[in-house]
Amino acid sequence: RASRNLPAILLASQLRPGFYGFLLRAGVDLPFSADHYGLSLVLGGAEVSMRELGGLYAMLANKGVWRHPRLYEGEAAGSAVPLLSPEAAVVTLRMLEDDAHFVRSKEGPVPLRFKTGTSNGFRDAWTAGVVGPYVLVVWVGNFDNTPNPLLVGGDVAAPLFTDIAQALASDAGPLDDLG
């Protein structure tokens, strides 16, 4: 699959209000000003936690409505913050879908909607996405931040993401799809 970085930069340059404000409304902690990040923000130019990243994917799965991410059942979800139209959320998830990537559940194939990433200098490899009602974020790296040329998201984090998604699909009942 070809990278979609250039269209993402073009789109971000046209957003009003900007992507920086969108991320702030989605609970992402950005310690510097919008000018500090510029358009690099759309390509991962700021550090985000796994919880923040998961919250963004959950917002897509919730048809554009963001809530503080819950890590366990029973944790308060907080108030709803509409950030995208339902149509924009569904279109975005469908852009992340690939016919070749799905898991099998008792109800049949379930598409995986995900994005991989590799940090500058090969310090982090990650995959984040949605499978049925679940949001998964997988990070692979060294806790001391040392680089490793093998830390490529599509090579090391994506297979783990797929394995976890398959385990969830095998253990769960029907995995609801986007209606």
Q: Language-model segments: which ranges?
A:
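A penicillin-recognizing enzyme superfamily signal
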Residues: 1, 49-179
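Active-site-adjacent helix/loop patches that line small-molecule binding or acyl-intermediate pockets
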Residues: 1-30, 34-62
